[in-house]
């Protein structure tokens, strides 16, 4: 690898890449500085005017998945340095970074991991044919001939490959199809979460960045959705630079690569990854400098906005009226002829899989609570409630149980419309809908938790508890139906705008864009940081198509075909005291209602071994799902299949009947299997993880020489990939783009 990089990425070429990167970054960051002032003004105006969607009926969890591990188990990873497949103990902590250890013993002994992979921008592939096609397309003229040796050989029929257009690739394989399906669901969850790297609570920096990306690409005549708008700001910015650098670099270096097609492909992957690292480090430095400068200037900008808010609004409305008078006739004709006829078909294509997915979320939630209620009847009531609720609280983050919901979005197609509206891929819409599904599931679960916790304060009997669970379930489902309708309608509107607005801007650009500079004189110089002609122009274009989009969504709600509430149905303060319940401390079901202390003597504390067992049991209860295998097995065979669940009642009426029958029985029936995400096979292991943090949290570097805690490392969202340390050593984990003694940052 070193020879390839030293040959094709010498100092002169690296300097040339750095200069081109510098030019692109400076051009983009001018857009970002412009958009920052506009975004700050919009945020403050929104805060003052108080406009926004209807109040949600469900509660939301302020600290989701605190101290949780999503998944753990063994898998084979291909080592590119020695071209060997090695068994790795792998786990996914609450921040969805895939952490790879040498083995389970290394994890238990607190040895630093081999790798921590941030999967933003990656695709999860399940066949070598898919991978070879993408690799062949990445470097023209290297498609392998039939019968020739491929770039990668997999020892089993069940590979999983993480592919990235610019960064290095990761190769895994499993021994069974069932294990492949499980890990595929887990890795897709990681990609989905890491792609959503810009925090939603970033009301200024986030919108400013995404608007700057859009404006910059439009200045290069690139309209439509962009598939690589994924990850945190530095990752997205690196993708933006590589989008421009990649083709020229490929043209320059492609003919110089030597060897067979598969060898040239391997060399290009190494070169692209090395360039991506260089670009990432450069983008990180420049972005942080500009962001720091803007944050220092923010207080002065806020003072101007507060003082002159009314004048800024008046000035902007005056500018909008002038632009509207100029472009409205052209825009209306364009909407009428090229957009309006296609809105119903686009909406229908979006609504069918999305509504099916949200219905599946409702069904899964209903089934899990129903099974838990039956288990409360069968297994001793409140004594086991803590264990059941601990598992139920993790339902939204259980990749296997949520997979049936996510799969409903896979059939989404915009056949015949993608080329017309320049939609490169539907993946951005699929992932957004899936994130909404997970959020709504967690909101429903958390609301159920909160209401049940309040009910438990009354000291109910087992019979009263079961009736209360059923009553709370019905109450939460009504709230879910309303919130899911609001979320879906908002998603449909946003998706339609995301599809149609770039198309309209591209259509209008030849006749309108050249005329925009003359409107600049209408903006007072003092307000020029908060009002931009280009943004106002886009808002006017948006307004021309918005009424058609709103009308289409409204008509869909009237039909009730997809269980959407009409806009006139607004549940104002239907449960005014509910949100007050969420202000308390998070509920720890294992601590408050667990049965871990029953076995200890009343006269004193448990012995050290018993205390360790109780601690280990509590930690295992906080793992969402596990397929951990024994180290002696050596191969990642499937740990086992979950016990089949008894037929669950399909509706509330049937459940009431079952509950009535069970409560009338004199003795409880034999205990049934717990069906709320219990791991099939577990091995005692440390399960403490770092505190929860938003997606864009920085990496916490370990000081030199300090032992690693029991906590699995977090993948830094300021990193674009993995950290690698040599086995058996305990070096500090730090950021670098070059090989260092025992530590290397991988992407």
From Swiss-Prot:
GO biological process: gonadotropin secretion; negative regulation of apoptotic process; negative regulation of cell population proliferation; negative regulation of DNA biosynthetic process; negative regulation of DNA-templated transcription; positive regulation of DNA-templated transcription
Keyword Membrane found: yes
UniProt feature, compositional bias: Gly residues: 593-602
Listed GO MF terms: transcription coactivator activity
Compartment(s): Cytoplasm, Cytosol; Cell junction, Adherens junction; Membrane
PTMs per UniProt: As apoptosis proceeds, degraded via an proteasome-independent pathway, probably by caspases.
Domain of life, per lineage: Eukaryota
Lipid positions (N-myristoyl glycine): 2
Entry-linked InterPro entries: Niban-like, PH-like_dom_sf, PH_domain
PROSITE patterns, per the entry: PH_DOMAIN (PS50003)
GO CC, any one term: nucleus
CDD domains: Niban-like
Residue stretches making up the PH domain: 68-192
Region listing for Disordered, in residue ranges: 589-747
Annotated membrane topology: Lipid-anchor
Keywords tagged on the record: Cell junction, Cytoplasm, Lipoprotein, Membrane, Myristate, Phosphoprotein
Residue numbers of Phosphoserine PTMs: 568, 574, 605, 626, 641, 645, 648, 667, 672, 683, 693, 697
Biased composition (Basic and acidic residues): 708-722
Biased composition (Polar residues): 734-747
Listed SUPFAM superfamilies: PH domain-like
Family the entry assigns: Belongs to the Niban family.
Free-text function comment from the UniProt entry: May play a role in apoptosis suppression.
PANTHER family per the UniProt record, alphabetical: NIBAN FAMILY MEMBER (PTHR14392), PROTEIN NIBAN 2 (PTHR14392:SF2)
Annotated protein name in UniProt: Protein Niban 2
Organism from which the protein derives: Rattus norvegicus (Rat)
Gene that produces this protein: Niban2
